[in-house]
Amino acid sequence: MAAAAAHPIVNLNCFSFLIFVIIRILNSINITSAIPRGRWELLQQSIGISAMHMQLLNNDHVIVFNCTDFGPSSLSLPDGICRNDINDFFLQHHCTSHSAEYDVFNNSIRPLMLQTDTWCSSGAVSPDGTLIQTGGFSDVGRTARIFQPCATCDWQEFPIELSAPRWYPTNQILPDGRVIVIGGQENNYEFYPKSLSISSTITSLFPITLLEQNSNLYPFVHLNVDGNLFIFAYNQAILFEHTTYSVVTTFPAILDYQPRTYPFTGSSVLLPLRNLLQQSVEAEVLICGGAPWGSYQDATSGNFTQALNTCGRIRITDPNATWTMETMPLPRVMGDMTLLPNGQVLIINDAVRGLAGWGDPVFYLVLHRPGNKNGSRFQVQNPTTIPRLY
């Protein structure tokens, strides 16, 4: 049974951890065939924690972390270290880890110490490879966390770094190396570290009207080739100039007008840039899945609507940009999309119905090949056996 989440969550893996290996598809294989492809390899039966958030770093290690207050994990902290937080609702004292470092090459796990609750936080990786994670649940919404890759490094946590509490925000790295933190129960944004040009007498919070009118929870944000930000919320998008705090372009609504951001929870990627040698580089955004309008009200009454099976694609560098729509092989809500080294897009996880979780999982992966013609871009891969959704 699918259901609306009792507590909303980021759309990432939330059950036992599985690193997958997709075997390269040979050119001789007929790509129009409906036969699923790829092979799964189980590397760890469990790493001891749930993978709510995951980030691959530049040393080929994956940082995995989860909320800290829903119960002890199966991974103990080292050297008698324990976590104490009198403000937690369920778990004020325990000695288990809610974060781990996975070494891809050695297939090994190292427990990490998280004091603050990263539930529904957001992050980005800086140019030097440092993971910057901001926001979180309850009293830690203004927290910033730093993880620098090294053999013995652990989380560094700074409780009052943000100007406003952030829960369900989105982070995006900027050309100057700073991170912009957008939304998250707020219809505004701020920078981390804060801009040196901002006077202490001037607020460092800047409103975005789009987020007032739509959802400000986990908006989709991508850095355009001109330095402006593509921001998508609910079913609409803008191109935003973050240095002048102005809207450069208002894009048309996605053609089916269906909502895609949390809690309707589709997924989005900036497609690989393909014409880097030309004078004007083109940039395209792909948004897939989600839940139809009205599904939130339906879920509260026990009716779990089928997820969307459509994708929208838009070339955000065009002066008169328009959406084109595609149909996926399967409906998906609360999935993940990631770019592969060959320029293809992997669509993974999800539920078939409901919103923001959590039953009726989609086991089949899908490859999206953006260079193919519309109608021949999707290729179903062999299924996993493990549900991965909230």
Predicted regions and their residues:
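Short loop/turn motifs that recur once per blade in beta-propeller domains
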Residues: E41-I49, L112-T118, P159-R166, F206-N214, ...
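Asp-box/WD-like beta-propeller blade repeats and closely related beta-sheet repeat scaffolds
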Residues: G141-P219
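Beta-propeller domains
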Residues: I29-L43, Q55-L114, T134-A151, E212-G354
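Short loop/turn segments immediately following the C-termini of beta-strands
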Residues: N59, C67-D69, D128, G136-D139, ...
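Beta-propeller blade signature
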Residues: C95-N106, R142-T152, N187-S197, Q236-E241, ...
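Beta-propeller and closely related beta-sheet repeat lectin domains
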Residues: S50-M54, D60, S97, W119-A124, ...
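Short, conserved, GDST-rich strand-edge loop motifs in beta-rich repeat architectures
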Residues: T68-H93, C288-T305, D350-V362
